[in-house]
């Protein structure tokens, strides 16, 4: 028994809502994966806030039809498609997919769309090589901390340097008095 029209409308509405929250959509060929393997992929993607949707290409086509941001996705809608809808941390999501692909070797990345731009496989791999959000925040925090430390050391050096200079002048004057006497 096929899906009812009402059911299809619900699926399209759900896809539109998920796409609205997403920054990146990846399309993979998933033919040959078992239910357990798809569940494993979803489990791996969950920590990065990524949703894996397996739906008909026509329903995804209807969902993106009125949204220019996702229009390029229509070029990737063919065959058995699974959609990885990434909300924020696309680097972690791509790495999670690549790890899954290394284990199963059953999927093929067709491409993706980010900010209205069609991404081919090399583009997606380049995005995956970027540091994750947490790593970037750590690097920024480290740089800020290092800057604050340098400022504190610099501020402490000014009075210390001044005190040493005054002491040197005082020693010179005292030493000069001793030799004159």
UniProtKB/Swiss-Prot annotation:
CDD domains membership: Ribosomal_L10 (cd05797)
Keyword Lipid metabolism: no
Protein family membership: Belongs to the universal ribosomal protein uL10 family.
Protein name: Large ribosomal subunit protein uL10
Subunit annotation: Part of the ribosomal stalk of the 50S ribosomal subunit. The N-terminus interacts with L11 and the large rRNA to form the base of the stalk. The C-terminus forms an elongated spine to which L12 dimers bind in a sequential fashion forming a multimeric L10(L12)X complex.
Source taxonomy: Bacteria, Bacillati, Cyanobacteriota, Cyanophyceae, Nostocales
Gene Ontology terms, MF aspect: large ribosomal subunit rRNA binding; structural constituent of ribosome
One protein family per Pfam: Ribosomal_L10
InterPro entries, alphabetized: Ribosomal_uL10, Ribosomal_uL10-like_sf, Ribosomal_uL10_bac, Ribosomal_uL10_bac_type, Ribosomal_uL10_CS_bac
Keyword RNA-binding: yes
PROSITE patterns per record: RIBOSOMAL_L10
One of the GO biological process terms: translation
Job of this protein: Forms part of the ribosomal stalk, playing a central role in the interaction of the ribosome with GTP-bound translation factors.
Keywords from the named record: Ribonucleoprotein, Ribosomal protein, RNA-binding, rRNA-binding
Encoding gene, per UniProt annotation: rplJ
GO cellular component, one term: large ribosomal subunit
């Amino acid at each position: 028994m096929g899906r009812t029209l009402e059911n299809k409308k619900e699926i399209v509405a759900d896809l539109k809502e998920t796409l609205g929250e997403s920054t990146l959509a990846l399309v993979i060929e998933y033919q040959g994966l078992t239910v357990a393997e798809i569940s494993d992929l979803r489990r791996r993607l969950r920590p990065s806030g990524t949703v894996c949707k397996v739906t008909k290409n026509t329903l995804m086509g209807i969902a993106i039809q009125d949204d220019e941001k996702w229009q390029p996705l229509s070029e990737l809608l063919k065959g058995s498609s699974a959609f990885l809808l990434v909300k924020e941390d696309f680097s972690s999501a791509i790495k999670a997919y690549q790890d899954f692909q290394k284990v199963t070797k059953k999927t093929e990345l067709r491409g993706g769309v980010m900010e209205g731009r069609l991404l081919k496989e090399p583009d997606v791999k380049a995005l995956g090589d970027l540091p994750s959000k947490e790593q970037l925040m750590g690097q920024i925090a480290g740089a800020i901390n290092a800057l604050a430390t340098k400022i504190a050391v610099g501020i402490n050096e000014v009075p210390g340097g001044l005190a040493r200079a005054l002491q040197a002048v005082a020693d010179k004057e005292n030493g000069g008095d001793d030799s004159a006497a």
